Regions:
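A membrane-interface helix-boundary motif in multi-pass transporters
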Residues: 41-83, 264-287
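Glycine-rich segments within core transmembrane alpha-helices of 12-TM secondary carriers
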Residues: 13-45, 56-57, 249-262
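Structural signature of the two symmetry-related core transmembrane helices
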Residues: 189-204
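Extracytoplasmic gate region of multi-pass secondary transporters
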Residues: 32-45, 118-165
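Juxtamembrane intracellular "pre-TM" segments in multi-pass secondary transporters
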Residues: 100-128
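Helix-to-loop junctions at the C-terminal end of transmembrane segments
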Residues: 40, 174-187, 269
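Intracellular juxtamembrane helix-capping segments at the cytosolic ends
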Residues: 1-10, 225-241
Length: 287
């Protein structure tokens, strides 16, 4: 879908179009978090506690536990059924909609070896793939460990999840804000300014111990908002139409960075202190 969006108009506005299209992705993530936090979790009987805060589930008979499992399964199942129906409806709409022809549809096919050679010798593309890999790693680390950061401050997990929702809300808002700003500010310059903002917030998350540090961590999300689609668009700017499909595939594969780096951050968090800082704070040196 991303190469399709890039090819639908002029190259000058391609990255802006992609940012606008990608602005709808966080809506799904935010909706999922909201459904889990405000609809699913409060209805789970297995999570009920007594006045002392202890789970009641372990004190029940096997028959009562079986009833609770069936109830909780239904609570969790129903949202997925609804999502499946919505996805099916979207699939039908796409199937019956005539898509416009694009530059990539008319491009001549070339062999894989030639395409790989073209991509490898394109410096902007090559650096774009590397940048995308490290960006995705930073994004996943930032979001994965918000709850651990809040937990260190004595904030319970239910409240900590709300900070996750706040981060995703800022991320969603940032996508629309950055799309608007691209009308007036050069795409590369805007990417640089947002990267500086993310770095400043990261320093706050590392060196400020307390609630201000937590808000700094959450604030990184607004600056991350434009990065994936903008890096993607810039990397493919000078790629020939015949090489776009494979080039786009490597950019998507760059998300492997999100799987490689979080375990390393987890190892740092497992330490008590690092250079005089709480380990959870120091771990954000990585992103």
């Amino acid at each position: 879908a991303n190469p399709f969006i890039l090819s639908l108009g002029s190259k000058e506005t391609a990255t802006r179009r992609l940012n606008l299209a990608q602005a709808f992705n966080p809506m799904g993530s935010l909706s999922g978090m909201a459904v889990a936090s405000f609809i699913v979790l409060p209805q789970l009987w297995s999570d009920r506690r007594d006045a002392a805060g202890k789970l009641l589930f372990s004190t029940l008979s096997e028959a009562e536990k079986a009833d609770i499992r069936l109830h909780d399964l239904a609570v969790i199942r129903d949202p997925y059924v609804a999502i499946g129906l919505v996805v099916l409806a979207i699939l039908v709409i796409i199937a019956i909609t005539r898509m416009p022809k694009t530059q990539t549809d008319n491009a001549e096919l070339t062999n894989v070896r030639a395409t790989l050679s073209n991509l490898w010798h394109n410096r902007i593309y090559r650096e774009g793939v590397a940048t995308q890999m490290f960006y995705v790693a930073a994004q996943i680390m930032t979001w994965t460990f918000i709850i651990q950061y809040a937990d260190y401050l004595g904030i319970d997990k239910a409240t900590a999840q709300k900070y996750n929702i706040l981060a995703m809300t800022l991320f969603l808002s940032g996508r629309f804000i950055s799309t608007f700003l691209m009308k007036y500010i050069n795409t590369r310059r805007l990417l640089m300014l947002f990267a500086i903002g993310a770095a400043i917030c990261s320093l706050g998350a590392i060196f400020i111990v307390g609630i201000v540090g937590l808000y700094s961590l959450v604030g990184i999300s607004i600056f991350m908002s434009l990065m994936f689609p903008t890096i993607y668009g810039i990397a493919l700017e000078n790629v020939d139409a015949k090489d776009t499909a494979l080039g786009a595939a490597f950019l998507v594969m760059a998300i492997v960075g999100g799987a490689l780096m979080p375990p390393l951050q987890g190892l740092i968090i497992d330490q008590y202190q690092v250079f005089g800082l709480p380990a959870v704070n120091a771990s954000f040196v990585l992103p």
